[in-house]
Amino acid sequence: MISRIFCAIAAIFIAGSAAASDVRRVVTGLDARNHAVVLFDSSIPLKQDSPVLSSTNFWITDSTPPSLSMQDTANRPIGVSPPENGTKFRLVEFAPLDPATEAKLPPEMIMKGVTHPPQRGIPVKHPMMHRTRSLDYAVVLSGEIDMMLDDTSVHLKQGDVIVQQATNHGWVNHGTQPCRILFVLMDSKEP
């Protein structure tokens, strides 16, 4: 129930800005008197990472527990994995991928910025397959997408929630509309 409410609020907030491809990010903190204030309030553009996806980082931490430094920690290269002992809060927009284009994807196109390619010894069934050494929480905000795993695929729609535990996976949008997914990635130990 709570996850559905979160999904609905997040979908209204983020999917509503889909036309502009920018997302408003509001970050709060404390001033010198320990009063809650707005530190950052601005539009964050999605950056095209590849022909099939765009993304942006909202916030990144470099330690657990995180430092509340009041500095903008998201202003760094996008990449996929969170920093060691850190977290990454990000939005990814997957463009529709028609079968003809999908068939032409080069096998070496492991997603840009992935520090952990698929598990060794397991054949890669799609160029978008990859792995992050992280525990990931994800919410499909808009659109539909197929999450590929080693031996199966799962079709996901708006409002679906994913908990991914450092597994091989890939994302392919076989629909006609972009799919936006909100991710929180937390660094983990190797499984």
Residue ranges and their predicted role:
Residues 19-71:
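N-terminal leader/capping segments at the start of a protein or of a new domain
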Residues 15-16:
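N-terminal signal peptide c-region/cleavage motif recognized by signal peptidases
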Residues 26, 30-31, 35-42, 48, ...:
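Double-stranded beta-helix
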Residues 123-126, 130-132, 137-158:
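A short beta-strand-loop-beta hairpin characteristic of the jelly-roll/cupin
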